[in-house]
Amino acid sequence: TIAEQVGLSHTPCWRRIKRLQESGVISANVALVNAKKVGLGVVVFVTVKLNSHDEQILAQFESAAVAMDEVMQCYIMSGDVDYLLRVVVQSIEQYEQTLKRKLVNLPGVAALNSSFALRELKNQHLLPWQLVSTGNLQH
């Protein structure tokens, strides 16, 4: 159990977990589903350039992009592109339809570039705790 691993009894451990959840350090408890096993084996990284950096356009794009079921992650980027999306679909054909029907119609899109992942080498969900200051966890 977690309590045994951290050297606490059950009740203090549970209280600590609750405090970490309430403070936002623990943001969710989830079961990770293997995308390939459920038929979503095509991963596409899409870079997006917008035609304007007007706050309204940015807000509209972000709202529409994060509402898309196919978009697993959306990052605001520095550098040559404005956003990076990680998209999952069943097939290249399905991605083509997503591109034509949804992505190109997102507000403010000037250019899209799609890169298909050939194979996943690492997809880690555990944080590198050795890099975290323990002072940050005093919640």
Predicted regions and their residues:
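A compositional/biophysical signature of low hydrophobicity enriched in polar/charged and small residues
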Residues: T1-H139
